[in-house]
Swiss-Prot record:
It comes from Naja kaouthia. This is Short neurotoxin 1. PROSITE patterns: SNAKE_TOXIN. Keywords: Acetylcholine receptor inhibiting toxin, Disulfide bond, Ion channel impairing toxin, Neurotoxin, Postsynaptic neurotoxin, Secreted, Toxin. Residues 1-20 are annotated as: Disordered. Belongs to the three-finger toxin family. Short-chain subfamily. Type I alpha-neurotoxin sub-subfamily. Residues 1-16 have a biased composition (Polar residues).
């Protein structure tokens, strides 16, 4: 599986996920600088107030 891994509004980059990982994620939250976005492999659990979208196809988390 190949997932995007750039932060916020950086130029898109991707990474190959290891260990048979089958999910990509896109996590979004707001702090004092505005909205922040994190992307990567897996589907982590998040705290209240953090939006997360998980998906299962190559580069689906942009």
């Amino acid at each position: 599986l190949e997932c995007h891994n750039q932060q916020s509004i950086q130029t898109p980059t991707t990474t190959g996920c290891s260990g048979g990982e089958t999910n990509c994620y896109k996590k979004r939250w707001r702090d004092h600088r505005g909205y922040r976005t994190e992307r990567g492999c897996g589907c982590p659990s998040v705290k209240n107030g953090i939006e997360i979208n998980c998906c299962t196809t190559d580069r689906c988390n942009n």
